[in-house]
Amino acid sequence: MWIFYAIGSSFFAGITAILAKCGIKKTDSNVATAIRTVVVLLFSWLMVLITGTWGGIMQIDGRTLLFLILSGMATGASWLCYFHALQKGDINKVVPIDKSSTVLSILLALIFLHEGVTGAKIVSLVLIGSGTMMMITKKDIEIDQGKKSGGWLIYAVLSAVFASLTSILGKIGIEGIDSNLGTAIRTTVVLFMAWIMVFVTGKQKEIKKIEKKEFCFISLSGLATGASWLCYYRALQEGPASVVVPIDKLSMLVTLAFSWLVFHERLTKKGAVGVLLITVGTVMLAITA
């Protein structure tokens, strides 16, 4: 039964970007991020209740709380950049670049956490890095540089950078407390950050203007994230992590498949090879972890 939960985790994670893209055709990406974070926050605290770890709040010291807040701020910045990139660019290019945060995370872990590097890790990094570079064309760079406000590429790269910082800060902050509780606290920080961004940019007036259809898609993207978390947790409870984690990492393929079906986005031959390299590298990294 756990295999179905693992597949469900990958599926729901994969369709999150698709649902979000459908919800930000006219809606400002910052507003959409703030709305969906409300839904994600409910799921994150639901996970805390399910695992019965809410009592650990009283045991969190000042240092741990500080790093959890910093991690939450990095997560918020990553989400804001990610959905802005999705609004401006193609899913089949934004998502693979965002996934390259794995490379940065490992490099930062090596520098700041002094984690070891195995031969398998190096091969995985080379595959993911090479695959990501193959996804970016010269035309993408030229278009991005030609826009005063910045195109999708710069936001996709920033999303990956902030996501990598999230994992490092989160690892430091989550030491000694349950990961589900840590995630819930981080998501709470993200919620405040997202709504502050909405009010600072004066976008709060647009909330009333959101079309019902787009509001539904934005909410569904949050539900998809929550459903993915629940399935992933259940799969890890019943099945081996060595199989569950790689299956979850295949969510990118689900995203790319739906981007072709829903938005008719097509990969170039070079891009397809890039996706293959990223997938192999990611799965290899998950299996050898």
Predicted regions and their residues:
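Hydrophobic core positions of alpha-helical segments in small-molecule transporters
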Residues: 8, 35-36, 70, 97-100, ...
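Hydrophobic/aromatic residues within transmembrane alpha-helices
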Residues: 23, 32, 85, 111-113, ...
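Juxtamembrane helix-loop boundary signature in multi-pass membrane transporters
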Residues: 1-8, 103-161, 268-289
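Selected transmembrane alpha-helices and immediately adjacent juxtamembrane segments
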Residues: 148-181
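Alpha-helical transmembrane segments of compact multi-pass small-molecule transporters, enriched
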Residues: 38-43, 97-111, 189-193, 247-261, ...
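Hydrophobic/small/kink-forming positions within alpha-helical transmembrane segments
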Residues: 14, 18, 45, 72-77, ...
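Residues that define the loop-to-transmembrane-helix transition and helix capping
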Residues: 30-31, 92, 118, 180-181, ...
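Membrane-interface interhelical linkers
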Residues: 1-12, 20-68, 79-89, 137-155, ...
